[in-house]
Regions:
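Extracytoplasmic/secreted envelope proteins and their assembly/folding machinery
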Residues: 2-3, 44, 48, 63-67, ...
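Soluble periplasmic/extracytoplasmic beta-strand elements of cell-envelope proteins
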Residues: 14-19, 42, 80, 206-208
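Solvent-exposed loop/turn segments at secondary-structure junctions
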Residues: 21-23, 32-34, 75-77, 84-88, ...
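Conserved catalytic neighborhood of penicillin-recognizing serine enzymes
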Residues: 55-98, 108
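Mid-domain, small-residue-enriched loop/turn segments at the edges of structured enzyme/sensor domains
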Residues: 82-146
Length: 236
């Protein structure tokens, strides 16, 4: 059913779903895409890793940057936290730290290479484009759900940030009312993504949808219907 839906849509689509109770996986058209703001979920994980290592203090400033980056998708908060991943507070050093973390944890399709805009600070990059995939996003969310991303207490903090998400018009809007969901969106004029942990009536699951359609807004109702289809299939 999902394959048929994706085939009928314009552009490139990836969908990754994992039932967190029985381990069943649906992984359709996995490919690297420009992640837009979904990269922020990985910046969050690396930041907590730096806190756990004692390289960064979990203070009010850092907490506020994490909250802004995740719950309202603030670009400047993300750019700052990338700097905070380095002792020198250099953006490119911070990005290198994040990429070392990603490769150590097996996020092979994800890389952080430049700042996000619009933002107060000016553009910084190492010449490559940011990349990720629906599958890498799904693996990250599963680890957060299981309490194995950085540590159980930091996984809980990450889950709480995602649960406070304000950008709810993609995966969450396809779900029955009252269903708890922790998500992070990403969008530009050409890509539309959402990554979510859904706490369903019968089972909890991860769902990540990446789309590159080239036309702004085209994907939103389609992500919503993918979300509803998956929910009904796993929770009927």
């Amino acid at each position: 059913k999902l394959s048929q839906m994706l085939n009928s849509y314009g552009g490139s689509w990836s969908v990754y779903v994992k039932d967190l109770k029985n381990g069943g996986v649906i992984n359709l058209n996995d490919q690297q895409m420009y992640p837009a703001s979904t990269i922020k979920a990985f910046v969050m994980a690396s930041t907590f890793d730096q806190i756990k290592r004692g390289n960064l203090s979990y203070n009010a400033t850092v907490k506020s940057l994490l909250t802004d980056m995740i719950t309202v998708s603030d670009n400047e908060a993300c750019n700052q936290l990338i700097r905070y991943n380095s002792k020198s507070r250099s953006f490119l050093d911070g990005a290198r730290t994040i990429n070392r973390y990603l490769s150590a944890k097996g996020y092979t399709e994800t890389g952080c290479h430049h700042s996000l805009h619009p933002a107060a600070s000016s553009y910084v990059g190492d010449g490559s484009s940011n990349v990720s995939s629906a599958k890498d996003c799904g693996v990250l969310l599963e680890r957060i759900y299981n309490g194995t991303c950085v540590s159980s207490s930091y996984s809980r903090a990450m889950l709480n940030l995602l649960l406070r998400q304000t950008r709810r018009w993609k995966i969450p809007s396809g779900l029955p009312s009252g269903v708890k969901v922790a998500n992070k969106t990403g969008e530009t004029s050409s890509v539309d993504h959402d990554m979510a942990i859904v706490f369903g009536k019968k089972t909890d699951y991860v769902i990540c949808v990446f789309s590159r359609t080239g036309s702004e807004g085209y994907a939103i109702p389609r992500i919503k219907s993918i979300s509803g289809t998956v929910y009904n299939y796993l929770n009927k």
